[in-house]
Each structure stands twice: as structure tokens, then as C-alpha cells.
Amino acid sequence: GAMAFHTYLLDHNVVWGSLESKFINELMFSTIKKEAVQATEWLAKVLGEPEMCKGYGVRNTHLLAIAPTKSTALIVGSVSEGINPQVGFVFTQTTPAGEVFRIDPSFLKLIQEKGIYVSEDDKGTQDFLYDIVSRKGSIQHRSEFTEDEKAVYRTAFEINPYDHLDLVSERQKYVCQAQSTNLFLANMSAKEISKLYLYAFLDENILSLYYHYGLRDANIKTN
């Protein structure tokens, strides 16, 4: 499986959909597949081949699957889920103790380094975080960030969905089962959505689509 792919890109200041992101995507999942194959071959030698694997020199019929990991990603620190982009860099969650901020760990590090985040009890920090929440987790309207930072820190609804599908297609050859691929579409017409689905349908490496999240908001710009 895999989790926090987008978080990894954010930690390394890599723009989703860039050539570098494609190199990382290829290297990451080809390495996982290589290690998994070596492991199942070793297990077959040590424990023997199951009846359905006789003659293939492996212990497993399937090796890799990418689950959504939505709950797990939240529990381990609000990292990005599975192979999907981060929906927002700040949001609020109601708990028995009251309302708390959930902040993407990469974004938290950035705003701490820039001196924007002082503490969660600080009035200026709270105003900043609530402003991000009010913009669906987007930072594109904030003057504290450079254009390069804004390019890296785009939410799922601001990332070009075709770039997302291209990464899905690229890694599928290393994944045994279909990926849990979510689509995040902002301000798209029915015709544009149909065109996107056709793009996915005609790609032999895109085996399924999971959830389709739609958003109508004039403040959200997809790049």
C-alpha cells in the first residue's frame, strides 16, 4: 500500500504534475514493486509455493494495493491520504474537547519557519488559520507566500485533474489492483467532466475511479 504521497511532494517542494513529480512517482512505486517481488520470491523459497502459485516461484498471487487510508492519514498527523492530493491545508474538526485545527504537517512546518504560526492560542495565528479554513483550505489568496510556494501548496481542487490522472496511469503498472483514485473537480461544466472521464476511460492503465468530489466556488482556480 501507500500513504502520504502528496505530503512527500510537499516536504520536498515538488509541484504536483511537474516532471520531477513524475520521476518521483515512477521511482517510488517501481521500488516498492521490486522489493515486494523479491520478498515473495524469498518467502516461496523458505516456506514453499502455495498450490495456486506452483511453478511461478512466488508465495503471493497479489502484492500491491493502494487503499484510501482517509482515517489512518488523519490519525498519524493529517498527512495526505493514499495517492490522492490534500483537499485542504487547514480545516477544523469538532471533538469532545471542542473545535480543533487540523493542519497539514508540511504546511505547519512552512508557516512556523515563516513566523506566521506562533501557537494555536495566539490571536494572530487563529485569525490566519480561520482565514485558510474559510477558503476551503487554500493559501492562494495570502500575500505571505511566494508564487513558488503557492505552486507547490495547491489543494486537490486547485490541481489540474489531468495531472492527477497522469500520475495514476504512470504508477498502475506497478500496482496489482486498481487504485482508489478520487477526482476533485472545481467549477467544471458537465461537458468538461465528461471529457475528463473519457480521458480516464481511454487510458488502459486507469482501471477505476473511486469518489468524485465537486465544488462550486469562484475563489478556487484550477491550474
Spans of features found by a protein language model:
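A generic alpha-helix surface/boundary motif
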Residues: M3, Q38, P105-S106
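Conserved alpha/beta enzyme-core scaffolds, especially Rossmann-like or related mixed alpha/beta domains
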Residues: G1-A4, L9-L27, V152-T155, R171-M188
